[in-house]
């Protein structure tokens, strides 16, 4: 539920309950969005999650700033933190983790852009830490977007640190399903020197 307090300030409140004996949860969140101008906005949110199986309750917080530029380019800065008991898969951050992300997508042509993204992520209940810097190009052909790029990753834990590089391939396609906008996408990432170290992701989104 969202409330427009002024032309610049919007507040949101939500609650989701699942009464399943072992997987159930009670999730509440509060968010605020402030528009500095037509192209700049700041989002702040806080949520809490309780579990039906009496696992510890957890909280999560996030701050996000976004700037849209005249040529269609975009800059985004995001900080998020989730306690161990906040394991909501749609939160955008894993439980017991803190992350900082800075990204800039530069439009080089009407149908081609390059994104530079830096991420710093650390485990709250351990010593694991990961830092990465990636460059990804995207080419749009009608309703299809093709992506390719590289990423450098540094991983640290109590045993030491490791550096490696990956390549990224992905695609998205916009469709019309039952009269509603529908989008599907997939992405594949693999380390250059280790074929067993890879990531495969797929998603679908439909506006109701």
Language model features: what each stretch is:
Residues 1-208:
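Gram-negative and organellar
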């Amino acid at each position: 539920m969202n409330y427009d307090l002024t032309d610049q300030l919007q507040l949101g409140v939500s609650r989701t309950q699942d009464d399943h004996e072992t997987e159930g949860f009670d999730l509440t969140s509060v968010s605020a969005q402030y528009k500095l101008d037509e192209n700049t906005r700041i989002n702040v949110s806080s949520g809490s999650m309780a579990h039906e199986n009496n696992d510890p309750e957890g909280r999560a917080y996030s701050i996000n700033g976004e700037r849209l530029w005249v040529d269609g380019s975009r800059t985004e800065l995001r900080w998020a933190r989730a306690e161990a008991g906040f394991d909501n898969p749609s939160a955008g951050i894993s439980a017991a983790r803190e992350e900082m992300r800075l990204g800039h997508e530069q439009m080089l042509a009407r149908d081609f852009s390059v994104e530079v993204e830096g991420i710093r992520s650390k485990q709250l209940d351990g010593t694991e830490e990961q830092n990465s810097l990636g460059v990804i190009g995207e080419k749009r052909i009608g309703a299809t977007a093709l992506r390719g790029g590289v990423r450098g990753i540094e991983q640290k834990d109590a045993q030491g640190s490791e550096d490696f590089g990956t390549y990224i391939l992905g695609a998205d396609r916009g469709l019309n399903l039952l009269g509603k906008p529908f989008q599907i996408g997939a992405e594949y990432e693999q380390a250059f020197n280790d074929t067993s170290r890879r990531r495969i992701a797929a998603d679908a989104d439909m506006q109701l």
